[in-house]
Amino acid sequence: MNRLKDQYLKEIVPALMSKFNYDSVMEVPKIDKIVINTGVGDATANAKVLDSAVEELALITGQKPVITKAKNSIAGFRLREGMPIGAKVTLRGERMYDFLDKLVTVSLPRVRDFRGVSKKAFDGRGNYTLGVREQLIFPEIDYDQVSKVRGMDVVIVTTAKSDEESHELLTQLGMPFQK
C-alpha cells in the first residue's frame, strides 16, 4: 500500500474525526481524484508540439493523457472547433496517491524561490487548484529533452464539504501551504 494512503487511514482519519466531531468514518473527507491539465496553444500551428506535451504528461503521471479539443471556434486565435489544444489526465486510486506523494515531497521543493502554495486556491466546495509553471520540477523530465517549458494545472478534488475541511486534509497529507 502507498505510504500516503497508509498515513491517511491510520493517522489522518482519526485526527480529522476528533477535530471536526464526525459521527461516522464515512463523513471524513478524502481525496476523490487529481486532474492534471496542460494547455498547448502552439498546437494550432504545429501538431508535433502536442505530441511532446502528451509524452511529458504521460512520463509525469504514469498514465496516457486524453487530448482535449476546442469547444468552439475563436477567429482571433485561428482556432476551429474540434482542434486539439491540450491534454489532461485523471488520476484515481494508487496512482493518485503516488502522484500526490511525489508532488509534495519531491517536485514542489524543487520550485525556485518556493515559499509554499497559496491558501486562497480553494473553490468554496473543498477542491484545490495548483498551477505549476514548468514541467522541469518533476524528476521524470530530462532537462535536455525538453523542447519548450510548459506549465500545467493540478486540481485536487476532495469529498470535503468546506474549504476548511479540505485545507486541514491537505495539510495533514503534507501539502506545504504558505504561513
From Swiss-Prot:
Q: Which UniProt keywords apply?
A: Ribonucleoprotein, Ribosomal protein, RNA-binding, rRNA-binding, tRNA-binding
Provide one Gene Ontology cellular component: cytosolic large ribosomal subunit
- Transferase: present as a keyword of the record? no
What is the superkingdom listed in this entry's lineage?
A: Bacteria
What one GO molecular function would you report for this record?
Answer: structural constituent of ribosome
- KW Phosphoprotein (keyword) present: no
Q: What are the GO BP annotations of this UniProt entry?
A: translation
| Record-stated family | Belongs to the universal ribosomal protein uL5 family.
Q: How does it assemble?
A: Part of the 50S ribosomal subunit; part of the 5S rRNA/L5/L18/L25 subcomplex. Contacts the 5S rRNA and the P site tRNA. Forms a bridge to the 30S subunit in the 70S ribosome.
Query: What's this chain's function?
Result: This is one of the proteins that bind and probably mediate the attachment of the 5S RNA into the large ribosomal subunit, where it forms part of the central protuberance. In the 70S ribosome it contacts protein S13 of the 30S subunit (bridge B1b), connecting the 2 subunits; this bridge is implicated in subunit movement. Contacts the P site tRNA; the 5S rRNA and some of its associated proteins might help stabilize positioning of ribosome-bound tRNAs.
What NCBIfam families does this protein map onto? PRK00010.1
What this protein is called in its record is: Large ribosomal subunit protein uL5
Q: Which organism is it from?
A: Listeria monocytogenes serovar 1/2a (strain ATCC BAA-679 / EGD-e)
